Structures are given as structure tokens and as C-alpha cells.
């Protein structure tokens, strides 16, 4: 759409007039709250939950996949739904980052979820908040804890491929590298790292990310010595050296679709699937993580409590709030004519205060 000079002038007049209100709104919105949509979209959690329930009937992996999307979103410029954006002429998608390419999944489900939310509450719920709710609901539906997530985020105006490559933890990370990765985004407690790693209690991973552990760890020509020998043989059967590198393996062979504490039981038995998992218990630097692994393995509720706290801390990494960003209508693309959309968003936001 073409804007005349008078149209553009009017738009800027609106923005200037709202200047003081915008500042007040931005300051007021800095604190996320579970009640953010209680009046404007009270059924958003039910809509999100129903979408996931329907998808689980045909795709038991989707709960773990959605949780992973949220994690990978929050580690890159905060939880701003930047991971959901497709390529444009202005930026490259985070979907092409090393930690996401050919492994991040669930985007069509997010599309259907957003369409359902928009039908119920037009221009109200951000993709960032919707993905946060979806992650929580995915955990709960898989047998994990239930909690109300703090809300009030807005969506980014771009993706951050380079930042994704720099920030996302890799499956071959050592414990010092893992700690540095978490610390880099403000998650500096050992419990943040150990509890959030428990997200690997369900879901699957590709053989290509564990082949070195199984056959040529650190270029030694030998397997990772921290691997349980029986588990090693099981994994070699699932991932032959010259087999399908994209073949999938359960993170937790005990209860692969259930969100429970068996991940930590596995670590104690040296049955962590990827190196970065087993590092929490087997690294020489694990003096502050081993006690947490033991505690979570011994007590499901202890793990659940720590996981909820860590999820909320991760969800609060540099949130985009107030009049920053926008509320995308389609999670894959920045709103067209975003200036006018943002003006409407500001008016709606201020009027709701």
C-alpha cells in the first residue's frame, strides 16, 4: 500500500501525540505477569492446549519439539518468537542456524495454533507468549508439572541467525562450555543448567549428533569412555557407523514420551544420549551439578519445582514488552505496514491500562 505524504504525516502525529503514553506504557509493561490476558483473551491457554492435544494424536513427538522451540527462542535475544520468522530479503531465519537446521520442528502446528488464537482474540496475543504457553502446556500434557507462565511479551521485528549460531548450546559441548552458554544469557545458577537440561527427558535426537561419541570420541578412534557399555552397544545398534545419519533415537529409552525425572536416573547410570547431557554427571568440572542430578533423580517433585523456576527465569531473559516489537498476525512474518499496526497496538495497549 502506498502512503501519501499527508498520510505519513498523520501517522507520525499520532506517534508523537502518544509519546508520553508510550513511555508510561513501556515502563508499566516491563514486568511480565500470568494475568496479562485474563481480560483480553481469557481462553488463550485452552486454545493452545487443544491444538497440542489434537496434534499429539498423530505426532507423539510434538510436545518435546515445542518445548525445544521455546528454549531455542529464548536463548537468542530473549523469548521474542524470532525463531518462528522465515527468511526475508532483510534477514536470514534462525531456522538455518546449526542448532536448528533440519532439527527444529513443529512450525505448522504453531501456524494452526496462531490462527485459532487470532480467531478468538484478534491482534491480542503475541507469538512469543503463545509459544511460551505452548511449551508449558506441552510439559504438562506429557506428565510434567503445571504452572501459570508470566506473560506480556511482544514479537521481534527480525531474526538473528548469527546470534543463534553463537548462543545455542551444542550437543558436543563440555560442561565449561555449557555453563558459559547459559551464563551468557543470564542463567548463572547451576540449577538453571541442570533443570532445563531435563527437557531431554522426552523427545528424540538424530544419530549424526552422537556418532562421534559411539565410534571416534575426540578423534581417539574409541567411544566416549563415560558411556555405559551396555548402552553403547544399544546405541550402536540404533546408529550404525555407515547408517542413516538422520535416524532418530529417544533421549530417554525408559519413558520416551513422558516428562519425568528418568533423564537424571539415566545420567547416574552413564546413559545420557548426547555428550552435553552426560557432562552434567561425568565431567571433572561437575562438582556443582552432580548433587543436583542426584537430587532430581531421587525426587520427581524436586526436579519439577526446579524446572518451573528455571523455565520462568529463562522466560524472563530480556523480554520485549510494552511498545517494543509488535504482535504478529502470522508468526512466520513481520506484519506488513508495520508502522500502522504498531500505532494500533499502542492505542490498544494504552487503552487497556
Swiss-Prot record:
Gene3D superfamilies: 1.10.520.10, Peroxidase, domain 2
GO MF term (any one): metal ion binding
Cofactor note (record): Binds 1 heme b (iron(II)-protoporphyrin IX) group per subunit. Binds 2 calcium ions per subunit.
A Gene Ontology cellular-component term: plant-type vacuole
Cofactor(s) the record lists: heme b; Ca(2+)
Residues that, per the record, bind heme b: 200
Residues recorded with modification Pyrrolidone carboxylic acid: 31
Catalytic machinery residues: 72
Keyword Endoplasmic reticulum: no
Residues annotated as binding Ca(2+) 2: 201, 252, 255, 260
SUPFAM superfamilies in the cross-refs: Heme-dependent peroxidases
Keyword Secreted: yes
Keywords: Calcium, Disulfide bond, Glycoprotein, Heme, Hydrogen peroxide, Iron, Metal-binding, Oxidoreductase, Peroxidase, Pyrrolidone carboxylic acid, Secreted, Signal, Vacuole
BP GO terms, sorted: defense response; defense response to bacterium; defense response to fungus; hydrogen peroxide catabolic process; pattern recognition receptor signaling pathway; reactive oxygen species metabolic process; response to light stimulus; response to oxidative stress
Binding-site residues for substrate, renumbered to this chain: 169
Induction record: Late-induced by Al treatment. Expression increased over 48 hours of Al treatment. Induced by oxidative stress. Up-regulated during a continuous drought stress. Early induced by benzothiadiazol, a chemical analog of salicylic acid. Enhanced expression following both compatible or incompatible pathogen attacks.
Entry's EC annotation: 1.11.1.7
Subcellular location(s) of the protein: Secreted; Vacuole
Family: Belongs to the peroxidase family. Classical plant (class III) peroxidase subfamily.
PANTHER family: PEROXIDASE 33-RELATED, PEROXIDASE 72-RELATED
Name of protein: Peroxidase 34
Lineage per the UniProt record: Eukaryota, Viridiplantae, Streptophyta, Embryophyta, Tracheophyta
